Amino acid sequence: MRRGAPQDQELVGPGAPGRGSRGAPPPSGPVVPVLVFPPDLVFRADQRSGPRQLLTLYNPTGAVLRFRVLCTAPAKYTVFDAEGYVKPQSCIDIVIRHVAPHPRNYDVQDRFRIELSEEGTEGRVVGRKDITSVLRAPAYPLELQGQSDPTPHPEPHSWTASSTAQPFPENPHPQLATSSFLLFLLMGTVSVAFLLLPLQDELGSQLPQILHVSLGQKLVAAYVLGLLTMVFLRT
């Protein structure tokens, strides 16, 4: 365990701060929405370059935000850029690698927590979001890898309500109802329209000023469009 990080929210990555966020006072201002994509992490044990995922964190506000990545099982993951800053109306990519792709860890659900705080106010958390993480078994039989322990052993979460890990459902391809499909299609069309509209400070546009959007609105539209794309790919 890295020095300075509490046991229930240990930072996975270099540069753990001197104190955790469990005892931090609640934010006095409005809560900042934590926009991350994808909304959950699914690692594959047979991934050629090793089980890894790219997590994108968006900052739709007009201020610099400090972020930290915490985990319930820090020994199983390596997080590159586990803490840092996100510029206003910008985004940053965080690479997460699963370093324990063993059969006993298959289908065991862990959790990551993304915490946001204002620049220069240590410990004053203004936004947080929990995302789940799971390691999936290879598509080919375990005997081909010489593994002998295919039974997963759930580990308890230290800052979640459940005392045991709950595996993800084995059927990741639910069918969308017609009403849901039409709603998602409408949301996707609106998101694409927002991405095609000119920026507020863009010159030479023939569209009226009321149809000009900000960069933050385009980031939110891109985030929603990415979520809809994931839903369509899983159906």
Curated annotation (Swiss-Prot):
The chain crosses the membrane at residues 180-200, 213-233. Its main location: membrane. Gene3D superfamilies: Immunoglobulins (2.60.40.10). It is found in: Membrane. Residues 33-145 form the MSP domain. Residues 1-30, 143-170 are annotated as: Disordered. Keywords: Membrane, Transmembrane, Transmembrane helix. One of its GO terms (cellular component) is membrane. It comes from the Eukaryota. PROSITE patterns: MSP. The keyword Acyltransferase does not apply. InterPro entries: Ig-like_fold, MOSPD1/3, MSP_dom, PapD-like_sf. The keyword Magnesium does not apply. It is a multi-pass membrane protein. This is Motile sperm domain-containing protein 3. It comes from Bos taurus. The gene is MOSPD3.
